[in-house]
Amino acid sequence: MNPDQEGPRAKIVDRSELQAKIASGRPFKLVMAASDFGFRAKRIPGSLHVDVRGANLSGLAKDDDIVVYCSNLDCKASKAVSKKLVELGYHKVSHYAGGLIDWEAGGLPIEGDWAPQSR
């Protein structure tokens, strides 16, 4: 799966848009595309895990509002998983391209084995 090839694309969201989505209280699925280790280490609270190949999509319905992210702008996993979801017919897919590093840079909470306990 090459995420840079043309085809259907997910909407890109930034940190403030993701914060607003969380604050709204409306249900959505926040999905981290990462290795098992990466997901266990640090993630945005409430995130679901999808492996970097997008192989385990159970728990996601085609009409769910879904935001996919990974570690940072250079990580291609979230772009690839977002593209795969759109190609599979998921209708409301967004891609938080800044990822975990952008979220942390904003001083926002994280959870996981490597998350600072003081946040």
PLM features per residue range, with description:
Residues 39-45, 57-61, 103:
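Short loop/helix-cap segments at secondary-structure boundaries that form the rim of catalytic
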Residues 31, 48-50, 67, 94:
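Hydrophobic/aromatic beta-strand patches that form the interior of the parallel beta-sheet core
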Residues 21-22, 54-63:
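Short amphipathic alpha-helix with an adjacent loop that forms part of the alpha/beta core around
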Residues 60-104:
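Catalytic cysteine-centered active loop of the rhodanese-like fold, especially the PTP/DSP P-loop
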Residues 24-30, 45-46, 91-92:
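Short active-site oxyanion
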Residues 48-49, 110-114:
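Short, hinge-like loop/turn segments at secondary-structure boundaries
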Residues 1-39, 112-119:
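Flexible, polar/low-complexity N-terminal or interdomain linker segments that lie immediately upstream
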